[in-house]
Every structure is written in C-alpha cells, then in structure tokens.
Amino acid sequence: MVSEFCKVAGSKASHPSGVCHDVAMANEPGEGCIHVVIEIPRGSRNKYEIDHDTGRVFLDRRLFTATTYPADYGFIPNTLGGDGDPLDALVLLEDPVYPGVWVEARPVGVLYMHDEAGEDAKILCVPPREPRWENVHDLDDLTPQLVAEIQHFFEVYKALEPGKTSSTGGLAGREAAWDEIRKARGNYKGPAH
C-alpha cells in the first residue's frame, strides 16, 4: 500500500520525515551510490507527488507542455535542497519504474536550476550494476545529446503554466553532484521532536 510505503511528512515550511527519511536501511547503497525514491516515471507527462501528510502518491498535474520526463525522477531521502524539499534526482534507467520505488543510483553530475521556489538542483544518476552504464562515472561520460535533452526539458517543462518558472544554470560533474548531496544532507535535520 503506497500510503504505508512512502510517507513523507513536512513541507517547505518544515522538513521531510517518515519512512522515506530517518530510517535505518536494511539494504544500504553500495560505495559511491545513493538511494533515490522515484516519484515520476520516464516518459510521463503526469507529475506525481508523494503527499507530505498522508504518504499517498497523487497526480499533482499533467505537464502543460508537450514534453515528457527524460528519466525517472524522484528525490534523495534524508536531504533538504535549496527549495525546501528533498534534493531532486534523475535516474537514467532503460525502463521506467513506478512511483514509490527505491532505486540504487550512482551520481554522475548535477544540473543547476532555479524555479519559483528558489534553488532547485537536479542530481543526474545511473544504475550502478547495469552493463549499459558501467562506463559512466562522470557527466562527460554521458552523450552530449542526452545531456542536451535533459537540460532542454527543464528549461521548457513549466513554460505554459501560469505562475511557474524554471531556468537552468549550467551543469557540473560527479564531484559537484556529491557536494550538492553533502550540502543537502547537512541541511536535513531529521524529524521535529
């Protein structure tokens, strides 16, 4: 049941907690890897969000543009990004997965962004044990076309939505991605007691 699987409490005014945060993970990610909780499958125009109060996965909206998510999209547990939400991440999987699925991922880069909520970096990741991605360890290992498609998506995906904005501010490699992850982990304070 989704509501029991991935409850995320908190909001921009507080911080995330629940079973997607503050849990001792029985299956820790391998060295150089993180967990990403997927909210939106690759190829979707539907923007799903995990409700911060109930833990249910809701359809937030359908993108107003004719674009689709270029990769599985979600968040890194136990982090707090510049926009007050968990740090966003994309995982370049061959086949899309369902909202609520935890994926082990290897960060290879970061896309710097800004939207109506503030700083909104996106960590770019690949699956660590998939042969197609075994030689991808840094941003420069991705094809320029794939990187351009991801960047273009985030430049235009909110273009037709009233009151929404997004702009990209460049890309950086693996070390910058880990810097963002460490910063977001440092920002995360855990549940209020």
At which residue positions do the language-model features occur?
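Hydrophobic N-terminal alpha-helices or hydrophobic patches in metabolic proteins across all domains
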Residues: 16-193
